[in-house]
């Protein structure tokens, strides 16, 4: 009896040890696209020395994790196709295609979403869906001390709902590429508006340039508290600016936004002429108030409406009869 119990116990231990899960980068997830006709790198983390078994497209591949748990393997070249299951030990990734993968990076122009160009392209966007276009946007994350090994990603297919959150440039590029290549198209959007490329470069690459060498000689860049000190100083400056603006803004004090305010002595201007505000060729910096009276026919009373005021740079707030109906705090609309 003791012998039987011993054998069963050993078998249970063996079964558990072979089912240990691996950890994968966020980019490896359902609906992903792998690059065709080139070796496919797969990597991740596991228990030290653990055996890694990869099943893909009817074949199996094996490797072993290092002493510190990292592992990687290159799958052989694949032709375009899918959908497939990519299984790594007990982790299963579904609806995987092989096609062409593009990395899109940049600043705000690369982040501008489809929903913000709907005024011009609504009919085209609402009439198009394509399961062979897959998109993922790397979520915001940063580390001022060391490079990150992982990112948070979710792959989405090109349907009328999810496409609204695609970057517009990526969306139209993917449509064109899919029509031309007739294979699955994967778009990895790794962009962050307003950030400089140096922010995402390694120290080794930046040290090739003299101006960065000088910066790295300063001890502040190796101080983990330095980023927070910069952030706090900037927040204090912004707070002080808003306090001064509130104290000095005559329009705010005298309630110029209210319907009852008498603006009969205000100057009439042409907003399409850049000389208004007392300056040549460009308006004066500061806070400007504009008032315009419009008549709404009774037949439209109570209905939804869109007020189009054009591009207002850098920021604005719009009031109707003293009620704020919209504002922009972003200097590059739409």
Predicted regions and their residues:
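Bacterial Sec-dependent N-terminal signal peptides
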Residues: 1-23
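Non-catalytic, glycine-rich low-complexity segments
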Residues: 20-48, 96-104, 111, 270-282
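Aromatic-lined ligand-binding clefts that engage carbohydrates, nucleic acids, or primary amines
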Residues: 43, 266, 294-322
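Edge beta-strands of extracellular beta-sandwich domains
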Residues: 63, 91-100
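Short, aromatic- and glycine-rich surface loops/edge beta-strands on solvent-exposed regions
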Residues: 81-90
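Loop/turn elements at helix/coil->beta-strand transitions in domains of secreted/extracellular proteins
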Residues: 100-101, 130-131, 180-186
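Extended carbohydrate-recognition surfaces in non-catalytic/accessory domains of CAZymes
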Residues: 150, 154, 158-162, 224-305, ...
């Amino acid at each position: 009896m003791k012998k039987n119990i011993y054998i069963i116990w050993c078998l249970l231990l063996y079964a558990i040890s072979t089912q240990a899960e691996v950890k994968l980068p966020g980019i490896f997830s359902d609906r992903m696209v792998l690059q065709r006709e080139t070796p496919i790198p797969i990597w991740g983390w596991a228990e030290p020395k653990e055996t890694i078994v990869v099943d893909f497209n009817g074949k199996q591949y094996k490797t072993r994790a290092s002493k510190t748990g990292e592992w990687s393997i290159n799958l052989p070249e694949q032709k375009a196709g899918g959908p497939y299951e990519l299984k790594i030990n007990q982790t299963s990734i579904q609806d995987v295609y092989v096609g062409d993968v593009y990395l899109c990076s940049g600043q705000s122009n690369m982040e501008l979403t489809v929903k913000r160009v709907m005024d011009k392209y609504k009919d085209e966007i609402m009439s198009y869906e394509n399961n062979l276009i897959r998109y993922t946007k790397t979520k915001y994350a940063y580390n001022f001390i060391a490079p990150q090994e992982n990112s948070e990603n979710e792959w989405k297919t090109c349907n009328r709902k999810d496409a609204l959150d695609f970057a517009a440039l990526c969306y139209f590029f993917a449509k064109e590429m899919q029509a031309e290549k007739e294979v699955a198209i994967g778009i990895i959007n790794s962009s962050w508006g307003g950030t400089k490329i140096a922010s995402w470069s390694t120290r080794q690459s930046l040290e090739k340039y003299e101006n960065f060498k000088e910066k790295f000689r300063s001890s502040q860049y190796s101080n983990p508290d330095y980023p927070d000190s910069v952030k706090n100083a900037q927040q204090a400056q912004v707070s002080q600016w808003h306090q001064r603006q509130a104290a000095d803004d005559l329009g705010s004090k005298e309630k110029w936004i209210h319907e009852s305010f008498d603006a009969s002595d205000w100057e009439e201007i042409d907003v399409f002429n850049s000389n208004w505000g007392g300056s040549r060729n460009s308006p004066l910096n500061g806070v400007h108030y504009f008032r315009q009276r419009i008549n709404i026919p009774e037949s439209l009373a109570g209905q939804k409406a869109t007020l189009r005021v054009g591009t207002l740079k850098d920021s604005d707030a719009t009031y109707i009869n003293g009620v704020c109906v919209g504002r922009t705090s972003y200097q590059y609309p739409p």
